[in-house]
Amino acid sequence: MADLAKIVEDLSTLTVLEAAELSKLLEEKWGVSAAAPVAVAAAGGAGAAAAVEEEKTEFDVVLVDAGANKINVIKEVRAITGLGLKEAKDLVEGAPKAVKEAVSKAEAADLKKKLEDAGAKVDVK
């Protein structure tokens, strides 16, 4: 029984690539196909990637278009970023550009609402 526990422990330390290679070797040795388990493992890998994306904590607020009310958007950009008038105007006229980068989800939503209320089209990435 101790040998089985050691095998389980050794298998637990394998990387995904090593486990896939082990699977291929066992298929060749035993003359079987493990198509269904491989598909389940691939689906598990995709789920892990989706979980990582859901846990994103930093967002960029991107000004896509200033819209018709450019002056209000420039004022709001100045208030948000602390830029001078010329720098804020250049940022607004150079859209699409990031207004703020690496902000929390709540702050990104707040900034998006403020800019949209001023008349801008905003994207959060």
From Swiss-Prot:
One GO BP annotation of this record: translation
Domain of life: Bacteria
An MF annotation (GO) of this entry: mRNA binding
Gene3D superfamilies xref list: 3.30.1390.10, Single helix bin
Similarity-based family: Belongs to the bacterial ribosomal protein bL12 family.
Assembly notes: Homodimer. Part of the 50S ribosomal subunit; present in 6 copies per ribosome. Forms part of the ribosomal stalk which helps the ribosome interact with GTP-bound translation factors. Forms a heptameric L10(L12)2(L12)2(L12)2 complex, where L10 forms an elongated spine to which 3 L12 dimers bind in a sequential fashion.
Entry protein name: Large ribosomal subunit protein bL12
Originating species: Agrobacterium fabrum (strain C58 / ATCC 33970)
Gene name linked to the record: rplL
